[in-house]
């Protein structure tokens, strides 16, 4: 302990060597008296400059530290023990920065402060923080010359380990290493962090190039991203504008189409109204002209009622047809080309009516025989009075009805009736054979009339009710009377159709009812016989009622629910079979008894549940 140098002696040696000046060093030491926190950091590189506190004038420092008293030998930090410096040995100077730095580390690593520090010596040392000698020296607050020498020695260590900085540093005691660089050595000093103003770190041209390239790339990326985003936004806006324009155009087209359709519908409605007005005018004119054609005589009352009834029917039919057409137009909404087709059809149908008006002399021809028939009642004595009255009344009614109903005919009927009109000569011929009673037998086959004389009158009176078929019916009746063998076919077909329709379903119903009833009874008897035979056989035998294979499958399924590795012996399976049969037979017997007590012959689920409850209490 006596050989250990005191701090005052060490400082004297430093002053002698020229590493400390009296006025400026005092200021520096006062600044260093303030407590500072040491941060663990990596060693500084050769690029960092030495620390110079503000307000100090740098004196050229020799890289040699003279120790006034050194003990016999100095040991390395890796070796065991510590070499101590004493004041007995003389001062020695070393040449070269590398040797000086090594000597400073060697000497500073051997310093140990075991004495209690005084007030004056607080500014020259600090307590040791770590156990390694290099960290002891680095953690102590020492003058600038010692720190410079330590930095010089650390430069050699960094160069040997190829530690290269990647980014500019804000402090000289922090470094950033590349990802692929090796880890720093274990024996690295932890330098104190200085809070004073520092000079900027010098960057190598390589680092400057890299940083500039990175900045340019980042700028290019950001600009390209901004440009691309701007372009995308512009494209999206253009697409949206185009879509909006297309939608507007489509809406305009739809509106135009709707307007066109509405106009067409209005035109069609106007045309229909005009046609209806024309029809009404024609009907009124014909009604006015009817008494003039009949020789100024008023028409009978039944004919007027038939006229008005037919007029109402025709108007209702026309209105229904127009409503159907309008519904079809509204529901389907065809294209304008399809809608324009019915217009020419209407134009074609209008001239047909004018032709009918031009051919108006036809009804007077039918009415012309009225005075002739009125003059010849005595000449035709063979015909009975009923026949004459019916024949005289029928042409008048038919002529009046035909004259009154011609305007109310539908468009299709006008086309059909025009070719079927017969000249007046055929009409007169068809009336003459009615007077002969020998040709009347075909009418006797129709069961509707009791007397043969009433048949022609009924035919002639009933036909005018149908608007357009009156003329062809009269022609058919005339031909049928002239040719008797052809008439039975028409009359027989109508009568046979009316007779056969109700008879056919009755026969079929009888067949369907008879077929299922006959085989049911023998089947029931057979089933009963089979069941009875099976019961007798089972009573006399000792075999099991439950088959073995289905029961074994069911047992295996139940076993698999608990565990897959379970197995069963045949004896156990036989025992299960016997117990299940015994349980089922007991259940059926007892439930049968319960059903018989209830007055039933069939077993129900209620009986089984009752047996289970009773078994639970009994056993």
From Swiss-Prot:
Q: Biased-composition ranges for Basic and acidic residues?
A: 1-15
Looking up SUPFAM superfamilies in the UniProt record yields: Histone-fold
The Acidic residues compositionally biased stretches are: 230-287
Query: What would be the name of the gene that encodes this protein?
Result: H3v1
Q: Which GO terms describe its cellular component?
A: centrosome; nucleosome; nucleus
Q: What is the lineage of its organism?
A: Eukaryota, Amoebozoa, Evosea, Eumycetozoa, Dictyostelia
Q: Which Gene3D superfamilies match?
A: Histone, subunit A (1.10.20.10)
Q: One of this protein's Pfam families, by short name?
A: Histone
Q: Which organism is it from?
A: Dictyostelium discoideum
Which regions are flagged for Low complexity bias? 28-50, 66-99, 296-306, 314-325, 345-360, 385-408, 415-521
Name the segments for region: Disordered: 1-99, 190-526
Query: What's the domain of life for this entry?
Result: Eukaryota
Q: Which family does it belong to?
A: Belongs to the histone H3 family.
- Record's compositionally biased regions (Basic residues): 326-344
Q: What is this protein called?
A: Histone H3.v1
């Amino acid at each position: 302990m006596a050989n250990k140098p005191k701090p005052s002696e060490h400082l004297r040696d430093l002053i002698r060597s020229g590493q400390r000046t009296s006025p400026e060093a005092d200021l520096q030491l006062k600044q260093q008296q303030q407590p500072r926190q040491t941060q663990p950091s990596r060693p500084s590189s050769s690029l960092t400059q030495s620390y110079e506190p503000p307000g100090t004038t740098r004196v050229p420092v020799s890289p040699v530290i003279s120790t006034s008293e050194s003990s016999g030998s100095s040991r390395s930090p890796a070796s065991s023990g510590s070499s101590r410096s004493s004041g007995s040995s003389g001062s020695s100077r070393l040449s070269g920065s590398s040797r000086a730095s090594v000597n400073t580390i060697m000497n500073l690593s051997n310093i140990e402060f075991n004495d209690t520090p005084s007030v004056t010596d607080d500014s020259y040392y600090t307590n040791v923080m770590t156990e390694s000698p290099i960290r002891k020296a680095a953690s102590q607050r020492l003058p600038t010359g010692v720190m410079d020498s330590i930095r010089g020695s650390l430069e050699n260590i960094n160069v040997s380990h190829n530690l290269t900085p990647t980014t500019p540093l804000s402090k000289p005691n922090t470094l950033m290493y590349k990802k692929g660089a090796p880890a720093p050595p274990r024996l690295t000093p932890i330098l104190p962090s200085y809070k004073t103003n520092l000079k900027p770190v010098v960057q190598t041209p390589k680092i400057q190039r890299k940083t500039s390239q990175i900045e340019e790339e980042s700028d290019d990326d950001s600009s390209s991203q901004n440009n691309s985003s701007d372009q995308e936004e512009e494209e999206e806006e253009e697409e949206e504008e185009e879509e909006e324009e297309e939608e507007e155009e489509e809406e305009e087209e739809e509106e135009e189409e709707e307007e066109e359709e509405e106009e067409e519908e209005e035109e069609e409605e106007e045309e229909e109204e005009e046609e209806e007005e024309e029809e009404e005018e024609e009907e009124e004119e014909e009604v006015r002209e009817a008494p003039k054609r009949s020789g100024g005589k008023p028409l009978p009352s039944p004919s007027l009622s038939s006229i008005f009834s037919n007029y109402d029917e025709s108007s209702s039919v026309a209105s229904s047809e127009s409503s159907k057409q309008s519904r079809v137009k509204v529901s389907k909404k065809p294209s304008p080309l399809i809608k324009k087709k019915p217009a020419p059809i209407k134009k074609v149908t209008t001239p047909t009516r004018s032709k009918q008006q031009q051919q108006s002399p036809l009804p007077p021809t039918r009415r012309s025989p009225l005075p002739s028939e009125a003059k010849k009642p005595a000449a035709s004595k063979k015909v009975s009075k009923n026949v004459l009255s019916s024949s005289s009344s029928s042409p008048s009614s038919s002529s009046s009805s035909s004259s009154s109903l011609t305007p109310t005919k539908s468009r299709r009927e006008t086309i059909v009736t025009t070719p079927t009109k017969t000249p007046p000569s055929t009409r007169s011929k068809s009336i003459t054979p009615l007077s002969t009673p020998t040709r009347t037998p075909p009418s006797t086959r129709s069961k509707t009339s009791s007397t043969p004389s009433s048949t022609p009158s009924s035919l002639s009176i009933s036909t005018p009710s149908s608007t357009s078929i009156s003329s062809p019916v009269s022609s058919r009746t005339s031909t049928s009377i002239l040719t008797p063998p052809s008439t039975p076919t028409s009359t027989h077909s109508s009568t046979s159709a009316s007779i056969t329709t109700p008879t056919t379903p009755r026969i079929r119903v009888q067949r369907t009812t008879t077929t299922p009833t006959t085989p049911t009874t023998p089947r029931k008897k057979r089933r009963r016989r089979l069941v009875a035979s099976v019961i007798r056989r089972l009573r006399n035998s000792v075999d099991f009622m439950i088959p073995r294979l289905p029961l074994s499958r069911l047992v295996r399924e139940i076993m698999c629910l608990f565990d897959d590795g379970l197995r069963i012996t045949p004896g156990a399976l036989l025992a299960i079979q016997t117990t299940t049969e015994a349980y089922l037979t007991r259940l059926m017997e007892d439930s049968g008894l319960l059903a018989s007590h209830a007055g039933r012959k069939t077993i129900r689920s209620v009986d089984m549940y009752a047996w289970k409850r009773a078994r639970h209490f009994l056993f």
